[in-house]
């Protein structure tokens, strides 16, 4: 057997083997799939799924790839078994109606035994129990003894794309780690002896709704070899984690924890392996444009980061560490996946932010969880699990994981009940979609052709009305005063897409005038939304469609400016920045992008100046339609998550910008005129937003600001350049006045509190005072409590106030002997009392404050405090 091939060498030998057999080597697709039915790329065949389903014609008959994949369905097994992962690379060779079963099997055997030099006597294969053809090929053509060919059922060895559609049997090759055990006890489920490393899928049937199988005219091959598994075999290590693909990450985590991996106990090794696996996942997910969030693939990323952080704490790593292990993962991958190095800054910033946030979450919730674990013997209640989730940010999966480590379960049904209660309490209005329009369009699409778009070259056109809708329902005709949706056979109107809003304009005919305010499209049908100002519109009418040229000019200026903005951000701020969304309207533009931090004033100024320089340089805009792969090879920027056909439209401003885009644009950057950034803000974790204006809108924006400046000058009797100094002076005056007011409030509170001394009760050797001081603020309340405790001597003071509607402030002040002799602590005590008022808090043993949101419970809270302290001080 070949000795110690590196993971990189294994990958390259696989690709080279099939390239020599006329397979086109394709780069790995993004982890963000084009298939909307899955969150992440989970298999090597996923990018080719449209071909296998007959939805797309292949550009070549054979392909080979090394596809990065992420699966989290077995996340609880990661680190606990030898070969479960969330991130892995799937090596594959594919045939689209070209070679089939016999050739696929022959090449798989040749690759395994002659390229990777696996001893034939150590290989076992499986076939679908009804696939006699595959069985015969393995036995008669390859020469494998029949007893080493295992027949398996449909669950294990039959691939389906869904309830109906292409499907077929598969055959798997296993490596035998212990051939000395003999052939009489072959059990492929025994993963301590056998590891499946190569799967061959023979797509040869179509399954109909009744379950009947019909042979396909074009049969396909889909194979997958696990890179990590082959590395384990060839590098002769105990598990995938100890291969050179992962172990350097594990070793770095062990170094940070001051642990010797080889001497570590099994529990510690599990944590180290989890870190090694998950860090690979999160690095590649962020590199492919995914940001942590509470939904969809963003939540998968957040969950994986949090598991890394928690397992780091379990093995004794203090503070933030994840970027250190991420650096190793980046170094291991950059030669094959260059975007991990290109987006290193973004990756580290996202990891640092999420790690810091989760460390705060852990610190807040771990004490409560510890107390829950102490009192519960078998199960954490749904109420407690929901409190951890809702109040402390603990995901249910994390609570379940920790509970499992302690031998407990979690009442998930109870958790879901609490979640539903909260949703009912906080139910808010949601935007709804008018499905009546969609339903009508679905029916229309069966009878009318997609609209022909003319708007790239024509601003007006003669067209035929193919449908009229009123209130979402198709009608034969509609009269003046009616809000309508009109469908045409051809149109110059741009329909909203790619962030650019739809055109405005008019539809005219014999005594007909329809003012169009918006245009949308669905399934290639353009819907013109408007109001009939004059006349009657009828299906079949010939009309003239004319867009508002002024609105179009402004929209295309803003759209081209958006392209310039992205280029400037990449050039001046971070080359790894990518678009996360946009809006191009007639009067302004909005651009959302991945960036872990706010832009500085200097950066914003540089970006603005660069864009205006490009505008002044009068660059021509070149538009071309080409193949998607050709466009990418030329460097055209594509938006993550956007679906593109085989033919794409490329907007090229030479030496400045090149993007895939279906929108409308200026012919020369000089047409934009001017560009002005209005604001830069954060809209989500790791997502920033720039709003800007271009062209005539810049003058309108500056005039508006000029009016504000003039008004301020009149108000303060100063010149424009003197306004900042005048505002600073006013702020200083206001701050001084507020300090004086606070001092007066505090003095009043102290005077009022002194009058309470006579209300103090004697409890044995101690004094106890529990009282409410009206609406004074928290700072004054704290000062009053501290002063009263000093005047009372040994004892306890509890003060409360309601400084605002439904807002409660509470303070506890305990003397030294109350703390020492009675074992009471102000922080813990007042925090518990505050829960009655739907709040919390804490502080030092002698002085602490808390707050609450339910003022109606204040009397109950004070009564509880008095009762408990009376009992404790006796």
From Swiss-Prot:
It is found in: Cytoplasm. The keyword ATP-binding applies. NCBIfam families: alaS. PANTHER family: ALANINE--TRNA LIGASE, CYTOPLASMIC (PTHR11777:SF9), ALANYL-TRNA SYNTHETASE (PTHR11777). Keywords: Aminoacyl-tRNA synthetase, ATP-binding, Cytoplasm, Ligase, Metal-binding, Nucleotide-binding, Protein biosynthesis, RNA-binding, tRNA-binding, Zinc. Pfam families: DHHA1 (PF02272), tRNA-synt_2c (PF01411), tRNA_SAD (PF07973). It comes from the Bacteria. GO terms for cellular component: cytosol. Belongs to the class-II aminoacyl-tRNA synthetase family. Zn(2+) binds at residues 559, 563, 661, 665. SUPFAM superfamilies: Class II aaRS and biotin synthetases, Putative anticodon-binding domain of alanyl-tRNA synthetase (AlaRS), ThrRS/AlaRS common domain, Translation proteins. InterPro entries: aa-tRNA-synth_II/BPL/LPL (IPR045864), Ala-tRNA-lgiase_IIc (IPR002318), Ala-tRNA-ligase_IIc_anticod-bd (IPR018162), Ala-tRNA-synth_IIc_core (IPR018165), Ala-tRNA-synth_IIc_N (IPR018164), Ala-tRNA_ligase (IPR050058), Ala_tRNA_ligase_euk/bac (IPR023033), DHHA1_dom (IPR003156). Catalyzes the attachment of alanine to tRNA(Ala) in a two-step reaction: alanine is first activated by ATP to form Ala-AMP and then transferred to the acceptor end of tRNA(Ala). Also edits incorrectly charged Ser-tRNA(Ala) and Gly-tRNA(Ala) via its editing domain. The lineage of its organism: Bacteria, Bacillati, Cyanobacteriota, Cyanophyceae, Oscillatoriophycideae. Coiled coil: none annotated. Binds 1 zinc ion per subunit. It catalyses: tRNA(Ala) + L-alanine + ATP = L-alanyl-tRNA(Ala) + AMP + diphosphate. It comes from Microcystis aeruginosa (strain NIES-843 / IAM M-2473). GO terms for biological process: alanyl-tRNA aminoacylation. One of its GO terms (molecular function) is zinc ion binding. Its EC number is 6.1.1.7. The gene is alaS. Its cofactor is Zn(2+). This is Alanine--tRNA ligase. Consists of three domains; the N-terminal catalytic domain, the editing domain and the C-terminal C-Ala domain. The editing domain removes incorrectly charged amino acids, while the C-Ala domain, along with tRNA(Ala), serves as a bridge to cooperatively bring together the editing and aminoacylation centers thus stimulating deacylation of misacylated tRNAs.
